[in-house]
From Swiss-Prot:
It comes from Corynebacterium glutamicum (strain ATCC 13032 / DSM 20300 / JCM 1318 / BCRC 11384 / CCUG 27702 / LMG 3730 / NBRC 12168 / NCIMB 10025 / NRRL B-2784 / 534). Homodimer. One of its GO terms (cellular component) is cytosol. SUPFAM superfamilies: cAMP-binding domain-like, Winged helix' DNA-binding domain. Global transcriptional regulator that complexes with cAMP and binds to specific DNA promoter sites, causing DNA-bending, to regulate transcription. cAMP improves binding to specific DNA sequences, probably by altering protein conformation. Involved in the regulation of gntP and gntK genes, which are involved in gluconate metabolism. May form dimers which bind to the aceB promoter region in the presence of cAMP and repress the glyoxylate bypass genes. This is CRP-like cAMP-activated global transcriptional regulator.
């Protein structure tokens, strides 16, 4: 089983940076624990901390004035969030809520700026992290316009599998820990429509639905449907 230091060292912010410097910074970071369902920060509030998950899952979401929630992404071990507030003094652009119990390492803006000053390579890594997120956002917008709901459901399942999947007897187990409503928010469609697509995939033998997990039996057909 991986240790906390190994998980943190895989974070995008640390890629390509001197390992000794990374280990020194990791030792200086504060460790925090949040129970399942806890809100780490709310959309609109000020913030000056970034977080790197060491265990558990966090959902980032935005809320409409009428209370509706739009789920942006699900993050897991080695993923970083909250960094925008360090470089942009504006309010938080999303809420971060724990899907499961979460352990994380955190640093404030002063600590990060001092580290960037001592290790300029970190600035390039941060730009790469932000660029990858922008690419994913653009791809998600294109999917909402050009891809039907079953296609988006298939793509979402494959993305969750890529992030959280484990091999199990020739299939791929995805323990997503999400409710049906949260899956629908992640897809960007109604729960009824998403459930219909999932039921169709299950009927065709591509997947098996098992509580808050999905067993992907036929990755090839699911990938074709996602195109």
């Amino acid at each position: 089983m991986e240790g906390v230091q190994e998980i943190l060292s895989r974070a995008g912010i640390f890629q390509g940076v001197d390992p000794t410097a990374v280990n020194n910074l990791i030792q200086d970071m504060e460790t925090v624990r949040f129970p399942r369902g806890a809100t780490i920060f709310d959309e609109g509030e000020p913030g000056d901390r970034l977080y790197i998950i060491t265990s558990g899952k966090v959902k980032l979401a935005r809320h409409a004035p009428d209370g509706r929630e739009n789920l942006l992404t699900i993050m897991g071990p080695s993923d970083m969030f909250g960094e925008l507030s360090i470089f942009d003094p504006g309010p938080r652009t999303s809420s971060a809520v724990c899907v499961t119990e979460v352990h994380a390492a955190t640093m404030n803006s002063d600590m990060l700026r001092n580290w960037v000053a001592d290790h300029p390579a970190i600035a390039e890594q941060l730009l790469r992290v932000l660029a990858r997120r922008l690419r994913r956002t653009n791809a998600s917008l294109a999917d909402l316009i050009f891809t039907d709901v079953p296609g988006r459901v298939a793509k979402t399942l494959l993305q969750l599998a890529n992030r959280f999947g484990t091999q199990e007897a020739g299939a791929l187990r995805v323990n997503h820990d999400l409710t049906q409503e949260e899956i629908a928010q992640l897809v960007g469609a109604s729960r009824e429509t998403v459930n219909k697509a999932l039921a169709t995939f299950a009927h065709r033998g591509w997947i098996r639905l098992e509580g808050k997990s999905v067993l992907i039996v036929d990755t090839e057909h699911l990938a074709r449907r996602a195109r």
